[in-house]
Design a protein with these regions (language model features):
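Flavin-dependent oxidoreductase catalytic cores
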Residues: 1-164
Length: 164
């Protein structure tokens, strides 16, 4: 834990105090006897004491010995426990592809932030789809309305042609 804390101190010293700094950690390496969630809670507590603004709770994935149970929101419990036991702001990751699932993580207080990585790679329009699914009134800026699939059928140039 000493080396990453030294790195954090050096970054904090060089970075403007009023700008946030977060640290992404592997909350467990999924190996018996390896780095675990209890270690991550202690590490996150140290980071908070040094002024860290948030922790992104990811997990390992580098050993053949790891025993990972993968499924929707499978890494959320790590962020939840770190948040509960340290009070630091946490960001949850881990197959939060479905907008309602991602929202529930926030609403239920399991994390303060979420990150969508692979879900955005698979669906670059994820934020728009999520907003629509969750009932937000999303509008394209006028110059970009043509790119919205439901507006492409509409004759947006009709008024221009009639004026000519």
């Amino acid at each position: 834990m000493r080396f990453p804390l030294e790195v954090y101190r050096a970054i904090r010293a060089a970075w403007p105090e009023k700008r946030p700094i977060g640290v992404r950690i592997s909350a467990t390496d999924w190996i018996d006897g390896g780095w675990n969630l209890t270690d991550s809670v202690a590490f996150s507590r140290e980071l908070k004491a040094l002024g860290c603004d948030y922790v992104v709770a990811s997990t390992g994935g580098l050993s053949r010995e790891q025993k990972i149970t993968v499924g929707p929101a499978y890494q959320v419990p790590f962020a939840e426990r770190i948040r509960r036991e340290t009070g630091i702001v946490t960001m949850a990751v881990g197959l939060l592809h479905e907008p309602k699932l991602a929202e529930s993580v926030l609403v239920e207080g399991k994390a303060d932030l979420i990150a969508i990585g692979r879900g955005m790679m698979a669906d670059p329009r994820w934020p728009w789809r999520a907003a629509q699914m969750l009932g937000a009134d999303m509008r394209y800026p006028a110059p970009y309305e043509r790119c919205h699939p439901s507006l492409m059928r509409r004759d947006i140039f009709k008024a221009t042609r009639e004026a000519v």
